[in-house]
Amino acid sequence: VHRGLIFLPLNDGYTNDELLYYLRDSESKLLITDKETSSELKSKKLDQGFIIETIEKDSFGSISKKLIKNISFEKPVSRNLNDIAAILYTSGTTGRSKGAMISQENLLSNAQTLTEYWHFNSEDNLIHALPIYHTHGLFVATNVILLSSASMFFLEKFELETIFNYFPYSTVLMGVPTFYIRLLDSKKLTKKIVKNVRLFISGSAPLTKEINCLLYTSDAADEWL
């Protein structure tokens, strides 16, 4: 997006058939993935119509090597607000998944609105344990942090022990209902452990009435209000 490209986030758990559907339907020209997926696609000669570059968890790979050699790639490209920034595919509950085109203005206005509504500022520290191939973890959480100059603890996944370790240094947790169900099942969830957390956010799916009631009657209840 920084370089004017259109970004298509994809679940790394997709099968080859699913992956190829999204790549071909979106007419993608470049796939950035891990070495394992790259090797598998190339060995089966499925890498037709697009270039494959690799990147690993340590941020190194063929794409990072090329970026290091091409310093000019770091320079941002000016875009118009109505230019497409990303394509997000629907869940496909009523048929084959369809790509929704998200404009630069969509991302900016959403981040501005949520930053103001949630009162984010540079003093906030967000616990981020959401998948970044969904809009919640990728655009909602990340863009709000960038716009407000806040900080975040970027975790690979949601693990209770890790979350509790970060609570004392955090002011916000963004999660999904299952996060809060697991937190409520733990005896570690107390007023003391979450005393610095000013905001708990649940998205992606409805938070049931039962879970809401449990949150408000838990040992950490004062912090949810």
Descriptions of predicted regions:
Residues 27-29, 46-56, 126-127, 171-175, ...:
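Conserved helix-loop-beta element of the AMP-binding
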Residues 85-112, 223:
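Conserved AMP-binding A3 loop
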Residues 4, 93, 149, 204:
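Conserved G/P- and acidic residue-centered "switch" motifs that form tight phosphate/ATP-binding loops
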Residues 108-125, 133-172, 186-188:
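Conserved AMP-binding/adenylation subdomain of ANL enzymes
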